[in-house]
A protein has these predicted regions:
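Conserved catalytic cores of phosphodiester-cleaving nucleases, focusing on short active-site segments
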Residues: 30-36
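Non-catalytic C-terminal interaction segments of nucleic acid-processing enzymes
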Residues: 1-27, 40-133
Length: 133
């Protein structure tokens, strides 16, 4: 990821954030949280170990932060609707279950869910954080 930022000439530093993984200091009201695939997203939204993620979602809303979840699943998953066809080898939850949870979080908390190929993650983060809130 650092290489993508370096190539784009973007100054960056590592620091713990209250919410998410990436923020543009010039626009702290917009944050990107990266998920490596739908299995990780499903674990965060559906499993018994989801408390930390839900606290982060609530914290973002309380802070007035627009949270974007960027899932690096790739393949045929380009939109939330595509999630319905997903099948996990690890989770008892299916794609339709996950899609419904995603929609609930989007409607209740204003969280935006986007999907990209892993090779495009850095480029997507740069594009998203350059956008106005």
């Amino acid at each position: 990821m650092e290489l993508d930022f370096d190539r784009a000439g973007i100054e960056h530093r590592t620091k713990k954030l209250e919410v998410g993984d990436y923020v543009n200091p010039e626009n702290p009201a917009l944050v990107v949280d990266r998920k490596r695939n739908l299995d990780e997203l499903c674990a965060n939204l559906c499993s018994g170990d989801r408390g930390r993620f839900w606290r982060e979602i609530r914290r973002a809303k309380a802070m007035g932060v627009k949270l974007i979840i960027l899932c690096e699943h790739g393949g045929a998953v380009k939109t939330i609707r595509d999630v319905a066809r997903w099948r996990s080898r690890y989770s008892p939850f299916g794609g339709r279950d996950l899609m419904e949870r995603i929609y609930r979080v989007h409607i209740s908390y204003g969280v935006e869910f986007l999907f990209c190929d892993k090779r495009r993650t850095g480029e997507q983060i740069v594009r998203l954080l350059g956008r106005l809130s």
